Amino acid sequence: MAALYGGVEGGGTRSKVLLLSEDGQILAEADGLSTNHWLIGTDQCVERINEMVDRAKQKAGVDPLVPLRSLGLSLSGGEQEDAVRLLIEELRHRFPNLSENYLITTDAAGSIATATPDGGIVLISGTGSNCRLINPDGSESGCGGWGHMMGDEGSAYWIAHQAVKIVFDSIDNLEAAPHDIGHVKQAMFDYFQVPDRLGILTHLYRDFDKCKFAGFCQKIAEGAHQGDPLSRYIFRKAGEMLGRHVVAVLPEIDPVLFQGELGLPILCVGSVWKSWELLKEGFLLALTLGREQQAQNSFSSFTLMKLRHSSALGGASLGARHIGYHLPMDYSINAIAFYSYTF
């Protein structure tokens, strides 16, 4: 029987499995719950992975007792070597018919492997933010990703927090706002359904919900699209912070990544990128300044991309490559370029 190759996208909320034939065709897919082993524990993680792969095998008309040739898992927390080793041991021990070979990588590595063959940057701006560089040799480095207490600069949470902070500081006469706060202040009271600043404290402390708080970013985006100067200013600063994340990893980039026809590939993940036009000015400013300060002349262009397929596809590709097989991939279908720039 022809070999099958599997890939897993392991999300904190939802997960996906894809099964591919030797010629790179997607034969079956299956969705499931979170497979973040930090959140649910190793036991439940491996059980969910096995259950999803079994369902996908059945959809593909394959006997679940026939193991895959390889299974590449793109998981959050996939850089922790001890945890990865434990996961693979558990998968082999408890589910010997699941797969012959395993590779566990980070969610960033799976994402970039879906979009490009050689690596690049994954720049995440959703509820939180993170920047990961994956070089052609598979080595990784990064900037950010430490959560809202330590940063998450340029994320939805950060944008919401900046907006609230500017309003509070302006009313307190602690720091003058760069623009009139009227629109943002009213949007803040409306979103959190409170009459004054004291009401906001409940949402900041006793009933703090990071996702709910970050959701205020959407109202700032609406204000920016309506032309509110303060809302536009906050998004411009967010773009600058995201650009600075890229600048931070420039010294670690293999020069090969600058030389492709796309220039430096930057894969953009997360809902804040829907507001690219609002981020653009600050993003370009940060990259232009950073490039000049580091004298990075080889960094002459970049392309921003979004995924059209699950990072399980990249996971499958990396898993196959790990055992010496190159799955055919059509990268032009897997990701779409939405902005290119040459310095």
Swiss-Prot record:
The protein's name: N-acetyl-D-glucosamine kinase
Phosphoserine: residues carrying this PTM: S76
Protein EC: 2.7.1.59, 2.7.1.-, 2.7.1.60
Quaternary data: Homodimer.
Catalytic activity: N-acetyl-D-glucosamine + ATP = N-acetyl-D-glucosamine 6-phosphate + ADP + H(+); aldehydo-N-acetyl-D-mannosamine + ATP = aldehydo-N-acetyl-D-mannosamine 6-phosphate + ADP + H(+); N-acetyl-D-muramoyl-L-alanyl-D-isoglutamine + ATP = 6-O-phospho-N-acetyl-D-muramoyl-L-alanyl-D-isoglutamine + ADP + H(+)
Residues that bind ATP: T13, T127, A214, S271, S275
Pfam families: BcrAD_BadFG
Modified residues (N-acetylalanine): A2
Highest taxon of source: Eukaryota
Modified residues (Phosphotyrosine): Y205
Tissue and organ distribution: Ubiquitous.
KO phenotype (gene knockout): No visible phenotype in absence of infection. Macrophages are completely deficient in muramyl dipeptide (MDP) sensing.
Species the sequence originates in: Mus musculus (Mouse)
Pathway: Amino-sugar metabolism; N-acetylneuraminate degradation
Task of the protein: Converts endogenous N-acetylglucosamine (GlcNAc), a major component of complex carbohydrates, from lysosomal degradation or nutritional sources into GlcNAc 6-phosphate. Also has N-acetylmannosamine (ManNAc) kinase activity. Involved in the N-glycolylneuraminic acid (Neu5Gc) degradation pathway. Also involved in innate immunity by promoting detection of bacterial peptidoglycan by NOD2: acts by catalyzing phosphorylation of muramyl dipeptide (MDP), a fragment of bacterial peptidoglycan, to generate 6-O-phospho-muramyl dipeptide, which acts as a direct ligand for NOD2.
Entry's Gene Ontology molecular function annotations: ATP binding; muramyl dipeptide kinase activity; N-acetylglucosamine kinase activity; N-acylmannosamine kinase activity
InterPro entries: ATPase_BadF (IPR002731), ATPase_NBD (IPR043129), NAGK-like (IPR039758)
A single GO BP: defense response to bacterium
Family designation: Belongs to the eukaryotic-type N-acetylglucosamine kinase family.
Keywords: Acetylation, ATP-binding, Immunity, Innate immunity, Kinase, Nucleotide-binding, Phosphoprotein, Transferase
SUPFAM superfamilies: Actin-like ATPase domain (SSF53067)
